[in-house]
């Protein structure tokens, strides 16, 4: 819950495309620490949201995530379960960050007075704005008529940010 500023109208796809273009280089000189999930591990947030890591089947090297959020806005309860792999992150990278209608109002008015918020670039194109009962703008990543944009943002983009903060980025 860092209050991350919005990036692009297309979520984080420009970052994904930049990484793909630059390529990934394996540094064989640096030691790598591997973590093994031996049993389900769940982290629960104060509002009922959670992230669960599941162990892979014997001989399998995949990581399965079960992510849920529960916001007191039109976003409401959302949940996705997926195996972490390239296509899942590309799908999730289309998700924009989100905020409530009240936060958007603040950013567009009083927030312009303060140096830490005046240039964050909040628009209805690059952020999902949720009112109490309905979205202010058009949500993306629909499944069965319901937007899962906020939970995909949490599952993919917030997870990448958290993992990047691990010791030595590994």
List where the protein language model places each region.
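Short acidic-hydrophobic catalytic motif
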Residues: 1-170
């Amino acid at each position: 819950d860092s209050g991350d500023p919005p990036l692009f109208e297309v979520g984080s796809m420009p970052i994904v495309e930049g990484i793909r273009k630059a390529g990934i280089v394996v540094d064989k000189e640096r030691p790598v620490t591997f973590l093994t999930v031996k049993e389900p591990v769940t982290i629960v947030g104060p509002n009922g949201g959670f992230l669960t890591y599941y162990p892979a089947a014997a001989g399998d090297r995949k990581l399965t995530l079960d992510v849920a959020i529960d916001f007191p806005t039109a976003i409401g309860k959302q949940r996705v379960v997926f195996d972490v792999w390239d296509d899942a992150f590309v799908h999730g990278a289309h998700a924009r960050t989100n905020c409530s209608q009240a936060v958007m109002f603040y950013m567009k008015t009083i927030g312009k007075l303060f140096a830490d918020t005046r240039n964050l670039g909040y628009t209805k194109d690059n952020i999902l704005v949720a009112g109490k009962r309905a979205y202010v703008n058009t949500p993306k990543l629909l499944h069965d008529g319901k937007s899962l944009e906020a939970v995909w943002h949490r599952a993919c983009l917030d997870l990448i940010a958290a993992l990047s903060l691990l010791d030595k980025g590994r």
